[in-house]
Amino acid sequence: MLSWGAANAQNSSAQVGVAAAVVGEVKLSNAQSPKPKTVAVRERIALADLIQTGKGGRLQLLLLDRSTFTIGANSVIRIDRFVYDPSRGRTSGATVVRGAFRFMSGQSNRGNSAAVSSPVATIGIRGTILEGVVGEGARDIAKHEDKAVREADADKKTATLVVLRGPGAGTEPGAEVGAASVTSGGVTVELTEPMQAAFVPRAGAAPIGPFRISPGGLSSLHDQVFPEKSGGGGLGKALLGGALIILPAVINGGGKKPARGSTPGPNDPAGVPGKP
């Protein structure tokens, strides 16, 4: 387990979202509580919290703007930044130390931006759905992709693979596909079409891409984010079944009817179930 130092003490108590779904071992630690504790459904997640999932653990984090951050097993993430103004949009940032993840933008794309960092890359996200994996899982997928990707000298701990998925069926009407950018080694690669991918093999290397991820690679990535075998059932049923349960009473204190989003499957070429 990783731990926090005193330098992070100032980043505490500012709520960024809640744990919307939890399966298996999911632990949380921060500067005030350096000893990891078990995360429960509806638990509030604060700025600078470090979240770690175990071998069978998975978590869906619902942010205040109704964006969602889902992490698979054996993953480590930290929410570094979150600014939300309903009238002006929001900006958020997270660090994925290792493991697989999915980020889905909230109901409105306008004025929203997000950034996800890995040990070797910075990923900008603008109004879309993005999946990625950091570490050995990224390297394993890369071995079966285009020649430039599979022959890259990839580091098994830090290699980073990113795939643009596009908006889900539950996104606000009129929402566009959005875009993502991957920056490393002073070079930026833009992903503007669903299923475009970029691969950063190691620190200091420029991103390889954009390239279209293979069906096998996409399936492997999807399995890392949403494993079919979900020991505790809750997250597997909610996400694999295509339903995202919003918890408005926890997020904003209101009593509105829960909203539902959609989770694209690995074979949805445009990132929208049932659409070509």
Where are the language model's segments positioned?
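Short, low-complexity, Pro/Ser/Thr/Gly-rich segments in the mature regions of secreted, periplasmic
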Residues: K256-P276
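Short hydrophobic alpha-helical membrane-entry/anchor segments
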Residues: G232-K237, I245-S262
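Flexible, surface-exposed loop/linker segments and immediately adjacent secondary-structure boundaries
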Residues: N8-K229, L244, P248-I251
